[in-house]
Design a protein with these regions (language model features):
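Conserved donor-binding loop and adjoining core beta-sheet/short helix segment
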Residues: 3-37, 42-71, 148, 152-174
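A residue-level signal for conserved active-site and pocket-lining positions in enzyme catalytic cores
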Residues: 46, 113, 215
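Acyltransferase donor/substrate-recognition loop-hinge adjacent to the catalytic core
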Residues: 52, 56-120
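A conserved beta-strand-loop-helix scaffold within acyl/acetyltransferase catalytic domains
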Residues: 91-179
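Conserved acetyl-CoA-binding loop-helix of GNAT-fold acetyltransferases
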Residues: 179-191
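Hydrophobic pocket-lining residues that define ligand/cofactor binding sites across diverse proteins
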Residues: 194
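Conserved GNAT acetyl-CoA-binding A-motif
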Residues: 197-205
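Conserved active-site alpha-helix within GNAT-family acetyltransferase domains
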Residues: 208-215
């Protein structure tokens, strides 16, 4: 392990076996953000938040190939407009945006997220401990809540400021996959919404493997 200072961010290098599903790469470049370090700059330089070790509460990021959309160039396709309008009307979907500190991360919410992770995560599902770490991280400050007839059907945990938004973790009721692409709907809604809010970029996490191609 080699630790150095790098543009006011602590940087450390490590070697590991290659396991993309668990965010382990042959040669890992990580940083630890401190109180005055810029989260936006970390994303700009290609780093993503790391929570693989639930016992480590430092603000760790890892360097990885990820997807960034320039929202100035983003245009919603007419076919997408049609599909999205149909989904919203058929399920009577509404979307609420909450600041992290105003949202109730209660037991019902936690069970919803962990249930989704057991059904959909390709690697290890979320533990209670790791979910609590995610909630406490500084790179989470805003959550989107998707409802159908006022019943929660999905959540997206994000970091948002005046310039960017990072689409970090999404959770949804998987029964809707039988009829609609609910995950893609949630992502596209946020992309389009943040374009309207004049954000410059949206970061859509990693892009390793076939399962990430839809991004």
């Amino acid at each position: 392990l080699n630790c150095v200072n790098h543009i006011s961010m602590k940087k450390f290098l490590s070697e590991d076996s290659i396991d993309y599903q668990n965010y382990r790469f042959g040669y890992c470049v990580n940083i630890i953000l401190e109180e005055n370090d810029s989260i936006e700059k970390a994303f700009e330089r290609g780093y993503l938040p790391y929570t693989g070790n639930a016992k480590n509460t430092e603000e760790i990021y890892y360097l990885a190939r990820s997807v960034r959309i320039n929202l100035n160039r983003y245009v919603r396709l007419s076919e997408n407009k049609r599909v999205i309008k149909k989904i919203k009307s058929s399920l009577n979907i509404s979307v609420d945006e909450h600041k992290k500190e105003k949202f109730n991360h209660d037991n019902k919410f936690e069970k919803f997220c962990i249930k989704y992770s057991k059904e959909r995560f390709s690697n290890e599902s979320l533990s209670d401990e790791r979910l609590q770490l995610i909630i406490k991280r500084e790179n989470y400050n805003k959550i989107y809540e998707f409802k159908s007839d006022n019943n929660p059907i999905g959540y997206v945990i994000t970091f948002s400021n005046n310039n960017i938004i990072h689409y970090w973790f999404s959770f949804y009721d998987t029964k809707y996959l039988e009829s609609i692409p609910i995950g893609k709907f949630m992502m596209e809604h946020i992309i389009n919404s943040e374009k309207k809010n004049n954000k410059k970029y949206i970061y859509l996490v990693t892009s390793y493997g076939r399962d990430s191609m839809y991004k």
